[in-house]
Amino acid sequence: MAAGAAVTLGGGLSACGSRGDVARAGTTDQWRQFQGATLNFISENTAPTAAIAANTKPFTDLTGINVNIVTLELTALVQRVALDLASGRAQYQVIYADPYQVLAPYQRGLVDLRTLEADPNLPRLPGGIGDFIPVQMDAAGRFVDPAAYYALPYDAPTMIWQYRQDLFAKYHDRMAHDLGFDPTPGGERTWEEYFRIAQWFNKNATSDVKYGTGHQARQHDSLMNDFSNVLWSYGGAYFDHGKEVGRLGARDPGPCRLDSEAAIAGAEFYNRLLSIADPASKTWDWDGVGAAFRAGRLAMCPNWHEFAASNEQVLPGKVGYAVLPKGPVATANMYGGTGVGISANTMPNERGAAWLFLVWATSPETQLANLKSKAGGGTPTRTSVYELPEVRAAEKRPSSMPNMLTAAAVRQAWTPERIGLRPKIPMWNECNTAIFTQLSTMLSGAETPANAMRSIKSRVDRIVARGWVA
């Protein structure tokens, strides 16, 4: 472990210290004014945090600040953060602020970072907030107020079409002849064509793969993500003004709209698609479908783009990446990114120290280092990093940064017309559980798609009607 960092997996902190503000040194060096301080960062166990935890020495050398990092599964993290914010103390000064389970429900417990960016005694963000990809800045950093921001974009997993390009090349002409269209994956393909491609592989390529497609359709958050891409492409929405509710959020989103004809049509297609997918799809989350794809079981799957690095280790040169297909109305690629924020319970100087960490952790230099890290990595959230010559070069094989092989696909996926944003509402966690539970019932055959959508609407409306107090 690098000097200056202590990582605790699923446990408590080392060196929490007594409650009291950190000292501020009399120095003109903005980066050294809180030397000797210790920060506690609580994060989900993600790729960028793994990379940072493996190498916090540059931050400690720059600032004199030590960092303790606690990594937890997301549900446990949310519980720990909620308790810490309610306590009035800041055991964790730096918080991995999941937009849907931390930012939306607990926004009042996070610092409006504009106050720190405007402080002349603190370093400014290199490139300002304008260097962050705009839709990510809104989705991961803001809640309701379009001016305030409570987190800086930190990671950006996004669902895209992952496919065996070696098999698509091998069978291209036969598929094109049999199907009557060019099967090459891309945004011009439709979900109906995706279905037919999967069906073709099921019938004609069993010597290479067992199934044409696989999905993260376990009764889990992954099922909501996988379904939502189809829902939105068919014109369905969870609530009115779905793009706005996803991008900036809402405290009261109004009635659920999953009983609409468009939503039901999307559910009917999704149910039909899963009927020809690998049957094990109903037991897989994103890790499960990713492992099955790497094992050579599937010709293609929708999955998070950050699986590219592990794909390249197992299937070097054999995997292609594209945006997800379009539906009758739209196209959507689910975004799962998160920001890092600062607890509003922090005292003035420890708040300043936490700001130094946020500026460093999201800086272009650190994001580039994370891309190269053997411990993790993720993908950058800043436009300037994607413009660096060495990052551009890594978009093509052979690549020293294999997640960059997805760059062309995710750049398209992050445009406002293609990005898929789930509702950013305070009660989303409970709504999400209702959604994936009922979807799982539908996939089991115990409920029709229409009845499943109506059941979800009824449950979500009751959840939203109760409101949220934090």
For the regions a language model picked out, list residue spans one by one.
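N-terminal export signals
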Residues: 1-17
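Hinge/lid segment of periplasmic solute-binding proteins
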Residues: 25-33, 99-160, 226, 320-322, ...
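Short, well-ordered beta-strand elements
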Residues: 35-46, 65-70, 94, 211
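Extracytoplasmic/periplasmic substrate-recognition and gating elements
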Residues: 40, 86, 143, 147, ...
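Short, polar/charged alpha-helical segment
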Residues: 46-66, 162, 166, 435, ...
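Extracytoplasmic "Venus flytrap"/periplasmic binding protein-like
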Residues: 57-136, 170-172, 176, 292, ...
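Glycine-centered hinge/linker elements that transmit conformational signals in sensory
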Residues: 191-202, 230-283, 324
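Long, aromatic- and glycine/proline-rich binding clefts that accommodate carbohydrate-like moieties
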Residues: 317-324, 372-437, 441, 466-470
